[in-house]
Amino acid sequence: MKIGIVTIVDYTNYGNRLQNYAVYYILHKRYGCKVKTLATHKEKAFCDKNYIAWGKEVFAKYFSSIVPCVAEKRFGNNITRWSNFCNWSKRIPTKHYYGNDKLSEKLNEKYDLFFAGSDQIWNYHFASFRKFNYNYFLKFADNKKKIAISGSFGVEEIPSKWRKVYIDGLSSFSYISVREDAGQAIVKELLGEDVPVLIDPVMMLSSEEWMQVSKKPRVDCSRPYILKYYLGDEAEDDKIDVWARKNGYEVYELLNDKIPELYSAGPGEFITLISNASLICSDSFHCIAFSIIFSKPFIVYNRRGKDMDMSSRLDTLLNKFGFKNRWKHLLNEDEYLICDYELAKKQLQIEQQKFTDYISTVLKKR
């Protein structure tokens, strides 16, 4: 069976690359399908001119892989980081359509099924959705071929001006599954249908399977450390550094452009940094998801500096696995490293079976 994946393709975002790989891995490795991600021109490219973006990709692929240190000093951390993302992403078969906003209807003849998701493909706040909702609702494909896999809205409600777009788009799917309880409520309100809430695809892979695609970071992981990863403009972590150093921990902060070894880390290094951390502090959904995969203590921070409330994404994840007390404002310092995974591991097995049943049902219908 030949399957096309349609999702956000972002070569700067860990969670995006990892969820894309997970969907590919599940369908290809476990079900034997031929799978390819179908992408229009890359979101968040260095330049809107497609030929320049293409040139940067070629340069990063060949030059930075040969002499990464020179490339980093000469051309900056951003291109090295982007190169690491591109190189890691080679393991995800992807067909890029440069200069096209819409996927061609001709693809409908080439694939048996199309999977939309995972990630926030239906978040109307995102420029990618406003430009590519045609693709994320799979409007180029026959309705019977449309499958949504752990789709996320990233919001709790749809404003009136977007309702028709969502109703028309969602009603055309043959199967819909969502990632958050809020998404389930949105579909119920718009379509009157009950759809399953599934875990993010990254949680379908074991820690051992993720370590197979990990990479050794350029920082020392042999000493105890706390890993910080914040996507918001600011995080309420003013006390965590003091606590860490008082207790003998190094502090590693991803996205800190003052530390090239961390800032330029790709998805493979991201996996290793989480797997070896003593404690993870983050406002990122996927960072917390990987903390759970590796049974690591973690602290969840509110994401600041955003125009939208994204807490629904984390609420479902935390409530489902019994970690709703892991928000920073609910924890005392003596609870930072205490994180009981006995019930969470049992719940993960239940959720993985639900996910498997959904995929099996979809594929059997074909």
Where are these regions (language model features)?
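Active-site anion-handling motifs in enzyme catalytic cores
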Residues: M1-R366
